[in-house]
Amino acid sequence: MDYGKYGLKAYGALPNKKQMEWFRRGRSIFFHFGMNTFTDKEWGDGTESPEMFNPTDCDVDSWVKSIFEAGFELAILTAKHHDGFCLWQTKYTEHSIKNSPYKNGKGDIVREFTDACKKYGVKAGIYLSPWDRHEKTWGTPEYNDFYVGQLTELLTNYGEIWECWWDGAGSTEAVYDWERWARTVHALAPNAVIFGSLGATPWVDVRWVGNEKGIAGEPCYATIDASSLVYEYTTELNSGKAGGERFIPAEADVSIRPGWFYHESQDNLVRTPENLMELYLASVGRGGGMLLNIPPSRRGRLEENDVRSILTFNEMLQKAFASNLLDGAAVEASTQAKGAPSILNGGFFAPEENDKSPTLTIKLPQKTKINTIMLGEAIELGQKITSVRVCAYVNGEKTELFTAKSVGYKLIKRFDSVTADEIIIEISGSLDAPVLDKIGAYLINDIKNEQEKCAKISASTKITDNVAEIELGGIFTFDTVSADWFTEQGYKIYLFNGTEYDLVKEGNVRGYFRVRLDNPSDGAYRLKIEFEKDVPKDVDFILS
């Protein structure tokens, strides 16, 4: 749309073409597959033998076929996780698939992945962990040569790459040349968005949402100040900032299971299609993107439960938004840019500059039952709206349906069903003249949220003398550690931050062991409890 010919101007930080394509996709897939799949851990330490990697029935083509059939247009593969084990034939390390039994050392999972993406028309993305716990040069300036070498292999030998995903694990302790890495991506994969934060902030296109639960904030502005990424302020990452200095939308990452890697113990803890629908509304429906992880098993296959869930989720999604109930409605605007086509006919709603409280009224041809409204700004002109109220006339009375502090590329709000013949959108706050280019009303079947099923904590415990180490099978929120164990002694509880243990609680217990942490943990994969006396081998610790 050429908004300039209607006298409309852009405001503030603006999206680039890559970000607009990212918005259009809406939802993407993550495949966590690697050494951790075979060690039953979430984070490896780099000491694992390559011989442990041996999928017995690997079919990467079927992974991509499944997610293509479920409507996903982009998938990211963990080419290398923190343990440093590489899923391609890299020349920079022996800690790779070339020294595994898989296809007698001739296999290349990255090749199989990118070939399948080309076959099904799915865009390929790469996760190359900045942190490498196996590589001896990690933490030194020399590691940058090593990393750029591997990055170059991935970006030149496997076709076009559309997303490069960098997380911050281990990044505060290393000397990374983020600019050099980013310039490598820009040169070799010019259409790829870069996901990242910390030192990579000047070059990133997409930001972390501040949690690994797949939930964006309310509001969730695509604009944000750079400092929020540099220091990973999770509250700001989740909500963004109206009028922020950078345009960096939020990607909400979440796993279909409690863990990011496959654990057989979690086969019955797969998120339901209903829960995936809720997460879609809490990410894409709040102006962000959805990044859903599906971990292949030790066989090298996606499990049936996982595939069934995403296929049903896609069916629900397509059905929910198949019919815009505003079709055939009449539109009245308080004011409208001269010559602008109607928003219900492929146009937009842009009030005149002097209209400080613009209102859009939609008169339905008949009384219609609705429970969902979708709005969207012409985001290429900037994210402007900071306050909107949507009402409907129900039985002749004006009834508020919802209010919101941001709209962005897409806002989807559900509410209790009403039967209305008129819908009113009132924009009461905007940084500049607002422009809406999307509006829809829908009746979505009730969604029974079964997320509680997925919140159960799976963990394995190793007890050595007076120390209990608990390895979590994913990221969980918990604030209480307990055990059906009567004891009288002192204790210290530590949470693993990725590189070392942090002391979070100490004290004495007399009676059954039950300790409440001062602050909930929602990002640790591992914890350790040190006691004054030895711990019985059969003690079962419970996190809640």
Report each predicted region and the residues it spans.
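Aromatic, loop-rich ligand-recognition surfaces of beta-strand-rich domains
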Residues: 305-312, 320-323, 347-402, 406-456, ...
